[in-house]
Amino acid sequence: MSRFNVRQVAVLGAGVMGAQIAAHLVNVKVPVVLFDLPAKEGPKNGIVTKAVEGLKKLTPAPLGVPEDAALIGQANYEEHLEQLRDCDLIIEAIAERMDWKLDLYKKIAPFVNDKAILATNTSGLSITKLSEALPEAIKPRFCGIHFFNPPRYMALVELINTPTTAPDNLDALEAFVTSTLGKGVVRAKDSPNFIANRVGIAGMLATMKEVENYGLTYDVVDDLTGKKLGRASSGTFRTADVV
């Protein structure tokens, strides 16, 4: 394919990951529009507005300049799907429900332009299974792009292809993630939880087994497996609580 020129990115889902991915795109001066469901009360973009405002209060800060939150475009699936036509990269980051993701893909498919890459930020669902909801024309441009929390600070991004992902498209996306977003990319197979989470969960389970063997308390384990092992902020049990 020709050079992947990302003029604008759409992020679908204004939750913890979606909002922070949008923030990091703003940090590196990439225009971005953040989508979510229409609010049931008040302005239709209320869910996204609340998420964008929340970015200013998070620690560690997802925005290099808090005022740059205003640069994140706000949209909802009811009124603004036409905006997807102007996006060269669409990152889906909604809740980890296969059925919800498949429904969303069917809704957005008519608005994905014929050169855009569509990528899911799922942390472990089957990328191939997700691709089954897409038209044949989009499947070569669909893949997994797994950021880690918090995305501004975590260097790793996993890229996952399906049997129908065009290699040139994955190469182009990797170039964007490394050169523009400043991330290190590891390509993973479409296996449960990919690489990092699969290894991480195995480590947690092994640690929990030792807790039983030695009668350790949660606080002691989190102290031993937290900053003493180089983890940024949390040990085994605290991490298990949030993932």
Feature locations, PLM:
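Conserved N-terminal Rossmann-fold NAD(P) cofactor-binding segment
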Residues: 31-88, 98-99, 103, 134-136
